[in-house]
A protein has these predicted regions:
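Active-site region of glycoside hydrolase catalytic domains
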Residues: 1-177
Length: 177
């Protein structure tokens, strides 16, 4: 993490699944000496979750992964938030969630933030008149930029905001047409 150590909860999570990396002497010291200067993250949507208890059928480490993990036994299961609109891909549109994430990251780590992706995926069709009516994307970006502004107004530091990065993660999933 940004403090140069494995946090207790995350370390146990990795150990329970047999995923903890093999550490050699000096590795943890190296982590502590080489902390990040900023935090960069992608934000497209929020997810609501409910408990997903372990059972004979659902064992620790059992996961359902679609484009992103959707559930993990003993931890969580993604559920629809009926209070939010969603994109055509089912990603819930939540600008208040972006503001909350920014404030949480700033309060916890006190490192400047860079939003590396915050785009809006849609299926555009070029009409005969040659102009795509992109009101949904414009509204999405407007609301999310206002969320960044609100976070800045309470002291969150940013070093950048990118709508898309050079390599769009969604393109690998849905391709180009």
């Amino acid at each position: 993490n940004v403090k140069g150590e494995y946090g207790g909860v995350f370390k146990r999570y990795l150990e329970d699944r047999g995923w903890m990396p093999m550490l050699q002497e000096g590795d943890l010291a190296c982590l502590k000496e080489n902390k990040p200067d900023f935090i960069g993250f992608n934000y497209y949507a929020s997810k609501s979750i409910s408990a997903y208890p372990l059972s004979d059928k659902n064992k620790i480490g059992d996961m359902v992964i679609k484009l992103l993990p959707a559930e993990e036994a003993g931890i969580y299961k993604v559920v629809k938030n009926e209070n939010l609109n969603a994109t055509l891909w089912g990603w819930e549109i939540d600008d208040i969630g972006l503001e909350g994430v920014c404030r949480l990251l700033w309060e916890r780590y006190r490192l400047p933030l860079m939003i590396t992706e915050n785009g809006f995926g849609n299926k555009e069709v070029m009409p005969e008149e040659g102009m795509i009516q992109d009101d949904d994307r414009i509204d999405y970006l407007h609301r999310h930029l206002l969320a960044v502004k609100r976070a800045m107004n309470v002291g969150v530091e940013f070093i950048g905001y990118c709508n898309w990065s050079f390599m769009d993660i969604v393109s690998g999933h849905s391709g180009f047409s």
